[in-house]
Amino acid sequence: MISTDQRLTHTSCVYNRLMQERALIDQLQREGFANAYVWEDTPHARYPDHTHRRETAHVILSGELTLTMNGESKTYRAGERCDVPANAVHSARIGSHGCRYLIAER
């Protein structure tokens, strides 16, 4: 059964850009996220509607990523993070300069 509370969670604090990727991965692990890795997409890449079995965190390192869920779209840029709930149908669109981000799940 899919949770009725399927909204994107936006963390408004801007991550310190000097923080190393390792420190960001460590932070995600402290929050209970696992399998963290860096992913890089080419400009204008698109991911059609899909789901993940587990909650997924995305920490944008460079570029931008637009996520759409329940008809709501939000663009995330370097230093921002969004969490997508488990089993939430969503799509993603990458910006004109590509996107490099950490992704992890719990």
What are these regions (language model features)?
Residues 51-67:
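Short, conserved beta-strand element in jelly-roll/cupin
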Residues 70-86:
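Short acidic-glycine-tyrosine-enriched beta hairpin
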